[in-house]
Amino acid sequence: PIYHTHGLFTATNTVLLSGGSLLFRRKFDVNEVVSLFPLATSLMGVPTFYTRLLNHEGLTRDSVKHMRLFISGSAPLLAETHREFEEKTGHAILERFGMTETSMNTSNPYRGERRAGTVGLPLPGIEVRVTDPASGGLLPQGDIGMIEVRGPNVFAGYWRNPEKTAAEFRPDGFFVTGDLGSFDAQGYLTISGRGKDLVISGDFVEVLWFQGF
């Protein structure tokens, strides 16, 4: 939706600034979307778009031959969905991570490896770290913790709510996103879920694990 940062700033504004055109639809209708592929070059959507497209018999390599790019955001995309879509269409979905308070933070590369199950690498000028949700201490690579970001993309604070602003920022300027995740050895970030969804039971259980059932 265009009232979200992904739909407004990343999708709509960047296309218009580059002189492109947009095909706005009232809602996501999988039959209509498949029929519009010959008129488009890219699709920006959420993970449910791609799971529904995968179940459509009209999604083939031939039907997307005019397409240049498929982008997913706003929620984590299952690695299985990413792999199945690439097998069926030849296109590796470009997944990234952003939020209203920061706009885009990380992205899989346009040119380079788009790693399934990850939201890519920190964008230039943006610092991303993973910390212990309880202590705020920096966690080693591979450990799941709270994702924090710092950079010129981060907002100044919540409107007329200094208490919430103070609660969401670290003293060194990092913004606490509320999302849980981890880095792999190559620096790709994986989102595991929301901090508020965390169950304290001696270990972290990834929300995506449950969503796979």
Go through each PLM region and give its residues.
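Conserved AMP-binding
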Residues: 1-4, 75
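Conserved AMP-binding/adenylation subdomain of ANL enzymes
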Residues: 3-42, 50, 56
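Gly/Ser/Thr-rich phosphate-binding loop
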Residues: 17, 37-45, 54-115, 127
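Conserved G/P- and acidic residue-centered "switch" motifs that form tight phosphate/ATP-binding loops
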Residues: 19, 74, 98, 120, ...
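Short hydrophobic/charged patches on amphipathic alpha-helices used for structural packing
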Residues: 30-34, 51, 61, 166, ...
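Short Gly/Pro-enriched turn/cap motifs at secondary-structure boundaries
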Residues: 113, 117-123, 138, 169-172
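Conserved ATP-binding/catalytic segment of the ANL
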Residues: 137-142, 146-205
